[in-house]
Amino acid sequence: MNKKIHSLALLVNLGIYGVAQAQEPTDTPVSHDDTIVVTAAEQNLQAPGVSTITADEIRKNPVARDVSKIIRTMPGVNLTGNSTSGQRGNNRQIDIRGMGPENTLILIDGKPVSSRNSVRQGWRGERDTRGDTSWVPPEMIERIEVLRGPAAARYGNGAAGGVVNIITKKGSGEWHGSWDAYFNAPEHKEEGATKRTNFSLTGPLGDEFSFRLYGNLDKTQADAWDINQGHQSARAGTYATTLPAGREGVINKDINGVVRWDFAPLQSLELEAGYSRQGNLYAGDTQNTNSDSYTRSKYGDETNRLYRQNYALTWNGGWDNGVTTSNWVQYEHTRNSRIPEGLAGGTEGKFNEKATQDFVDIDLDDVMLHSEVNLPIDFLVNQTLTLGTEWNQQRMKDLSSNTQALTGTNTGGAIDGVSTTDRSPYSKAEIFSLFAENNMELTDSTIVTPGLRFDHHSIVGNNWSPALNISQGLGDDFTLKMGIARAYKAPSLYQTNPNYILYSKGQGCYASAGGCYLQGNDDLKAETSINKEIGLEFKRDGWLAGVTWFRNDYRNKIEAGYVAVGQNAVGTDLYQWDNVPKAVVEGLEGSLNVPVSETVMWTNNITYMLKSENKTTGDRLSIIPEYTLNSTLSWQAREDLSMQTTFTWYGKQQPKKYNYKGQPAVGPETKEISPYSIVGLSATWDVTKNVSLTGGVDNLFDKRLWRAGNAQTTGDLAGANYIAGAGAYTYNEPGRTWYMSVNTHF
């Protein structure tokens, strides 16, 4: 079957490349940004569920650690974990329309980033990861495109919630360079400060060649180990001295280079190579907030490191007949090196003091080939047909996560058909895809874009994803936009690997009184979601107003199973990762941009969540605000001076309704976070045409939240040893922080 799939991929690529006729050489200067036709991908950027963040917006509102801070100000976007557990609560990642970080696809220049997939998934689906939004320095970003709902489905695996496409600044045929620096100073000394500096250089390498090079170094200190002292949930017995940790620190080192060859008009080849190293500065976190003297001794140390290498070759082409192609191959290697961790019960995700190795490695190799062609067609109506194919392979060598013992202490006994020792550290999966879209201008005011995508996964089989987007002008000022698409996400390499086994003595087991195992399941189905949206938009003389309703009918969400699939000889129940039949996410997004005057602009967006429900259990899918309002007032006081005020208002945040055994949450597990707001001020001064300064303050009124623990109680509140649940209080909101940045360029 795989040979047939590979042969089909080769034929499709040959067919795509054979469509176009080379353009005759001319003396016309080459523009790197020429748009030949309006493709379906470009039309999708006009959908109601699409937002763009510009380089100037990033410059005037600089971020500290990574760009997730500014991405979260877009409609439908928040920061959260992958479940309602609250585990790793300060490692919050991008969540789009309540679908969770695992359903948010991160791209850099249109190419997927998968480094976070090298981090083990815990029993509740959480990963101890900072996500994939910090691999590009903020100052090197040209723009960020955030796609939500049906517009994102064209990107295939992992885009059921949405897509974040980070577009980097490009090289040119002229010499240019930049140097940037950023630092902040939290008003509370127990909160970690950030310093960052980076450079870029672009220029010609002869008549047809150009290059771009950038480098970056930044450091964020860890929060104090006792930052949450006095705010922790109730703890007793052996847990009495434990504390939930604050935000960990991080040291980033990045270097990236691109060489471009414009070998003919509208024809270019780009070769990219990049290397990044991210090391944490440990703040004391454990998966179950059950720190001890050994974990506390690691405070401030580097306990995990990610080494990322990426290489890509891209060919973009255009021809006299209007045909354009985009073809690339990317290789990404991530080495996740970390202190060995436990895999059983309360020790899961906790440093293993008895480990014989200081660090163990998880290596993830990701290869992707992508080819697409855009064909302008003048038949009945103006239309542009897009045809494409992709092939992706992920291979993992994990020397850490498949090592849970099945015999001896802290185990549940042997499992039939599973080796008690020396289980294979290897796992892999492949996806072959075909896709087609057609952007049709039926009238001057009506655009219809149907699409169809086919994915074949080497483990879970085939998936078909149809899509339809419609844009209908209603007079000069109003536009009605609608979309529906079937989105798709394949299970992770952990969820499908039978050698990945976790153990619990009982509390983690949904319907078992005693101990149980959780095992990877190679018989899983892919997650799917029918994403729908309807939006009405008004534009006139700089005014913009819009409202969008969205609903995602979620099928086969993958979670730890609720029903034991068997029992071993000593009575230990066996659970597997399983598909939840149905879930639903529904909400509203609104926007209002008002040109108050020639120099003052007021921009606003709001997201209101109507539903977020697992229909099997009745529980919430994630802990996110009921509503989020983002408002920015920008004033161009002088030609060289601009000022901004930002206001964000978060609605109440409700915790999970049920514990891991399906019993209603009680006592402190039901704590909600009340609505709160964050205000920021900033000013940008263009000192000269080559130098600008930005200074400001985040969280002006010093509204802080403290992490109290995980959502659910560990142990028995009526017993001697327990950690009470914290409800929704699972993360830290940092207080007032002053910052300054310097941007220079030539």
From Swiss-Prot:
Annotated keywords: Cell outer membrane, Ion transport, Iron, Iron transport, Membrane, Receptor, Signal, TonB box, Transmembrane, Transmembrane beta strand, Transport
Gene Ontology terms for molecular function: colicin transmembrane transporter activity; enterobactin binding; enterobactin transmembrane transporter activity; ferric-enterobactin transmembrane transporter activity; ligand-gated channel activity; protein domain specific binding; siderophore uptake transmembrane transporter activity; signaling receptor activity
Motif (TonB C-terminal box): 729-746
Pfam families: Plug, TonB_dep_Rec_b-barrel
Induction conditions: Induced 1.9-fold by hydroxyurea.
All copies of domain TBDR plug, residue ranges: 42-169
A single cellular component GO annotation: transmembrane transporter complex
Chain ranges of the TBDR beta-barrel domain: 174-746
Topology term for the membrane: Multi-pass membrane protein
Signal peptide residues on this chain, from the entry's feature table: 1-22
Biological processes annotated in GO: colicin transport; enterobactin transport; ferric-enterobactin import into cell; intracellular iron ion homeostasis; siderophore transmembrane transport; siderophore-dependent iron import into cell
Compositional bias annotation for Polar residues: 79-93
Protein's UniProt keywords contain Chaperone: no
Presence of keyword Transmembrane: yes
Cellular localisation: Cell outer membrane
Disordered: annotated segments: 76-96
UniProt short sequence motif TonB box, positions renumbered to this chain: 34-41
Superkingdom field: Bacteria
Family assignment from sequence similarity: Belongs to the TonB-dependent receptor family.
Function: This protein is involved in the initial step of iron uptake by binding ferrienterobactin (Fe-ENT), an iron chelatin siderophore that allows E.coli to extract iron from the environment. FepA also acts as a receptor for colicins B and D.
Annotated protein name in UniProt: Ferrienterobactin receptor
Gene that encodes it: fepA
